[in-house]
Amino acid sequence: MEFEIIFYKDSKGDNPIEEFLLELGRSNKVLTAKTRQGIAKLKNRAYHKEPLSKHLGSDLWELRIRAGNDILRIVYTFSRGRIVILLHVFIKKKQKTPANELEIARKRLKEIKIKEAN
């Protein structure tokens, strides 16, 4: 069985992950293609374990994509049933994941949990 992939949308209906990937496609087609492949594999459960995916603690995981020297991360969570919600995407430039990038994902996860509770 496949997972359903949902892209986070903000309160205005904007889709920052899809917007990021569209912009990335203009500058780095290889990384964009690998990212789309990674999302497809996540849908089919092929990326739910290391080294391609890593649990970040709490309800957050990261999908790890690399193309040459470029490293991209998508932070995601699991929701009811077989749903994966992509919360945040960024280009990783240092060894350690920046705290501000994780904070964005945590904030979006909190928004989703509040919506699901209502």
Predicted regions and their residues:
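Conserved Hanks-type protein kinase catalytic core
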Residues: 77
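Portal/gating segments that form or line small-molecule/metal binding sites
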Residues: 74
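Basic, Lys/Arg-enriched alpha-helical interface segments
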Residues: 1-71, 80-83, 91-118
